[in-house]
Regions:
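Acidic, mature catalytic/reactive cores of soluble proteins
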Residues: 1-474
Length: 474
């Protein structure tokens, strides 16, 4: 026996960190010069009497593969596309699913839908992406996409936004694969109509449409958005009411449905006048002006607003159908850039706000308190990049500035934590140490999609930046 073995990371995270380990025996092997030795453990039997030859061939191929990668000029997009394949897993029924993160996350609806375009449609895996998207559509129940999937089929439907992210994922598939419009009409359009019918008709638990067409979600005891941490039995970031990204996602869903209804000849699903009115209402409700400029409130509730500066406002600019008027983009981006942007992603709360947590550390409760209270999330860079491109009057200059800012994420972090991958989160304060899962699906996916967008917008600037980043320059 080996007694009192300690696990330092578990101790840091406030978990049980000591155990006794049984040692059943030992292997003694006499080494002979020039003769290989293999110590092999597997859950499957080797289908040959010469198992050592099989293992040797596997080893040789893997060595060649790694040496080839080290010597290649693989692009950052190509690298992230390859890393993204790790998150695509087979379910027991043979279908594809997305694992949210390694080592301890399962398959979640929201994470899957946000990660799917970067993992598949923009990574050369269109069939895999279509498979996952159609599978999610078949799991819709009363307008809701499951938030957490379980092996026994008893999925959890405890989110207000997963279904709205489904609409966004369909939009991304159509953008990347315009030849799939027929498939969208046949398989996705009925799902979108089901979602809109239930959300707009007040048929979804904890979701109620108001007279102006926006959605109120939850109550003080619920956590139905992506900022869903709970500590000591209460939501850490209460966002009941009308969270800004829910309003933006809902408007985007209605506007996309309006365009599909026009294309498919279904006028009963057109909402052009309602959409025009909603844009005006949105601005009046969420626009905040203070001594540091203008931005969007995080939540509108009972006629008042939560004025803390958070990154969720970006979705009012970045979605395919933005609910915010274009002339307001620059003000929002200026505030987000000054308060939230870091080299590794966006903070979830401005450092000047009460409740800001600079470090993600301590036991489970302490870490949950920091999870969305300043902690940096790389996946938000996708929305930030889209917003930057939408607002830019000098596209090459804006792309150059953003690439220069986030260079450490690609030039340094890919060699840290989960080597080659992108972590789930980082500390809010410098040096922004990585934390959480060492490889997170939507971090990898949205970073890949961001690079794709920036390369497409300014190919010369991007090529120069990538070449310099490989050499260790700026």
């Amino acid at each position: 026996w080996c007694f009192n073995v300690e696990y330092l990371v578990e101790r840091e995270r406030g978990f049980a960190y000591q155990e006794d380990l049984f040692q059943p025996g030992q292997f003694e092997i006499r080494l002979v010069p020039g003769k290989p030795v293999f110590l092999t453990a597997s859950t499957e039997a080797l289908q040959t009497e010469h198992g050592h030859n099989v293992i040797g061939e596997i080893w040789r191929r893997e060595v060649e593969r790694r040496m080839g990668l080290a010597a290649s000029s693989e692009s950052l997009e190509g690298h992230l596309a390859r890393e993204g394949e790790r998150f695509l897993v087979r379910r027991p029924d043979g279908g594809l699913a997305v694992t949210a993160g390694y080592h301890w996350f399962g398959s979640w609806g929201r994470d899957t839908l946000i990660a799917l375009p970067g993992l598949t449609f923009y990574a050369g895996r269109p069939e895999e992406g279509t498979d996952v998207l159609l599978g999610l559509g078949s799991a819709v129940r009363d307008g809701l996409i499951p938030n957490v999937f379980s092996a026994d089929g008893n999925h959890a439907y405890n989110s207000a936004d997963a279904s709205l992210w489904y609409v966004w994922a369909v939009q991304q598939m159509l953008k990347a694969l315009p030849d799939r419009k027929g498939l969208i009409r046949e398989r996705c359009w009925p799902v979108i109509k089901n979602i809109i019918e239930h959300y707009g008709g007040g048929k979804v638990p904890f979701v109620a449409p108001d007279a102006e067409g926006f959605l109120s979600v939850g109550n003080p005891g619920t956590q139905l958005t992506w900022m869903d941490a709970v500590a000591n039995g209460r939501p850490v970031t209460p966002r009941h009411g009308q969270p800004v990204e829910i309003s933006a996602l809902w408007y985007n869903a209605l506007a996309f449905a309006d365009s599909l209804a026009k294309a498919f000849g279904e006028p009963e699903w057109r909402r052009t006048k309602q959409l025009d009115a909603m844009r005006s209402v949105f601005f009046k409700r969420y626009w905040v002006t203070d001594e540091r400029g203008d931005y969007l409130a995080d939540v509108w509730r009972d006629g008042g607003v939560e004025t803390c500066v958070r990154p969720n406002q970006l979705f009012a600019l970045s979605l395919p159908y933005p609910v915010l008027d274009e002339e307001r983009y620059a003000s929002v981006l200026s505030r987000v850039r000054r308060c939230l942007l870091t080299p590794y992603g966006l903070r979830t709360l401005a450092p000047s706000a009460p409740g800001y947590r600079p470090l993600y550390e301590g036991g489970p409760a302490e870490r949950d308190e920091a999870y969305h209270q300043g902690t940096v999330w790389p996946w938000l860079l996708g929305a930030y990049g889209e917003a930057v491109l939408r607002a830019a009057w000098d596209v090459p200059g804006s792309v150059r500035e953003l690439l220069r800012t986030i260079r450490p994420l690609f030039a340094q972090h890919l060699g840290d934590a989960g080597i080659g991958s992108v972590s789930e989160i980082f500390d809010g304060d410098p040096p922004h140490l990585p934390n959480g899962c060492i490889a997170q699906a939507w971090s990898v996916a949205e970073c890949l999609r961001l690079l794709h967008l920036l390369k497409e917008a300014a190919p010369g600037v991007y090529a120069e930046w990538e070449a310099n980043a490989r050499k260790g320059g700026n």
